[in-house]
């Protein structure tokens, strides 16, 4: 009887061992570099690829598909900007989101991650066909390597990385609203800047002077939203709802009555 019990339990034991092996394998990303496999213990990290563009020590894109313009060339965005594939760009709704990116080859890669702010889109080439890809500034890409090996890493061109979302932090800055060129009392276009936390925008509403009604703004491209019914009467209050966690923030009378196109108006608050 004992021999029969041992024999019948063997298939169950084999299945258990196979299940554990497969489960363990699910947490291993093969970097494809230097023949090394790297274990990622945090399930928040996901596999992707990365390249770089511009000068080797450059800040990255000048402007970009999110519409941030010259903001990408100055602190706090300077050198931390990146273009992402459509999977992460999300038709512009991914603009402003922040990610930590880390490369995998232990022979050259730093253990620290680089924080990247989405400011642009890379729609074709290595970014096409549903791939998750980061096209980083030369400076950001080089910082993925251990000190003194940034140039060597850049010479590899495309590399394997892992990434995860992280909270955006703009060092004490409050959310600002840039009134885009061409705006009138019949067509108001706003660009959101320096949004802490999620960084992205799921919806945006505007309230006119002496009104209790919040009017839905339309996402038109990048990080730009607009409202067309007019005439519009300021001052304007603006309400943001983030795309990722649906947090809401209202900036009361943030845009004054005598607003002008191409001006930026800073609120007194930000997401925690």
Curated annotation (Swiss-Prot):
Report the source organism: Oryza sativa subsp. japonica
Give the record's GO CC terms.
extracellular region; membrane
Give the Expansin-like EG45 domain ranges: 63-173
- CDD domains, A to Z: DPBB_EXPB_N (cd22275)
Q: What does this protein do?
A: May cause loosening and extension of plant cell walls by disrupting non-covalent bonding between cellulose microfibrils and matrix glucans. No enzymatic activity has been found. May be required for rapid internodal elongation in deepwater rice during submergence.
Expansin-like CBD domain span? 186-267
One of the Pfam families matching this protein, by short name: Expansin_C
Q: Which keywords are on file for this protein?
A: Cell wall, Cell wall biogenesis/degradation, Disulfide bond, Membrane, Secreted, Signal
BP GO terms, sorted: plant-type cell wall loosening; sexual reproduction; syncytium formation
From the Swiss-Prot or TrEMBL record, state where the protein is found. Secreted, Cell wall; Membrane
For this chain, the family text in UniProt reads: Belongs to the expansin family. Expansin B subfamily.
InterPro entries per UniProt:
Expan_Lol_pI, Expansin/allergen_DPBB_dom, Expansin_CBD, Expansin_CBD_sf, LolPI, RlpA-like_DPBB, RlpA-like_sf
Q: Membrane topology for this entry? A: Peripheral membrane protein
Listed as disulfide-bonded, the cysteine pairs are 66-95, 98-168, 103-109
Instruction: Write down what this protein is called.
Output: Expansin-B16
Is Oxidoreductase included in the keywords of this UniProt record?
A: no
Signal peptide boundaries = 1-25
């Amino acid at each position: 009887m004992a021999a029969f019990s041992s024999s019948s339990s063997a298939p169950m034991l084999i299945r258990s061992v196979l299940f554990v092996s497969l489960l363990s394998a699910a947490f291993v990303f093969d970097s494809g570099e230097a023949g090394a496999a790297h274990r990622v213990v945090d399930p928040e990290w996901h596999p992707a690829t990365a390249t770089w563009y511009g000068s080797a020590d450059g800040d990255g894109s000048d402007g970009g598909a999110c519409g941030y313009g010259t903001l990408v060339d100055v602190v706090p965005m300077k050198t931390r900007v990146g273009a992402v594939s459509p999977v992460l760009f999300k038709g512009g709704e991914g603009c402003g989101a922040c990610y930590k990116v880390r490369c995998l080859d232990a022979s050259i890669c730093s253990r620290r991650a680089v924080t990247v702010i989405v400011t642009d889109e890379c729609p074709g080439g290595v970014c096409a066909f549903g791939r998750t890809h980061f096209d980083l500034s030369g400076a950001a890409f080089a910082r993925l390597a251990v000190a003194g090996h940034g140039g060597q890493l850049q010479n590899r061109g495309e590399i394997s990385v892992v990434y995860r979302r992280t909270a955006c932090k703009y060092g004490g800055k409050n959310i600002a609203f840039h009134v885009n060129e061409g705006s009138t009392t019949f067509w108001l276009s706003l660009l959101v800047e320096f949004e802490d936390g999620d960084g992205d925008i799921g919806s945006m509403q505007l309230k006119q002077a002496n009104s209790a009604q919040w009017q839905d703004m339309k996402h038109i491209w990048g990080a730009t939203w607009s409202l067309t019914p007019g005439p519009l009467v300021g001052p304007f209050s603006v309400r943001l709802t983030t795309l990722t966690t649906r947090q809401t923030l209202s900036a009361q009378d943030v845009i004054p009555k005598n607003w002008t196109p191409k001006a930026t108006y800073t609120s007194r608050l930000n997401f925690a």
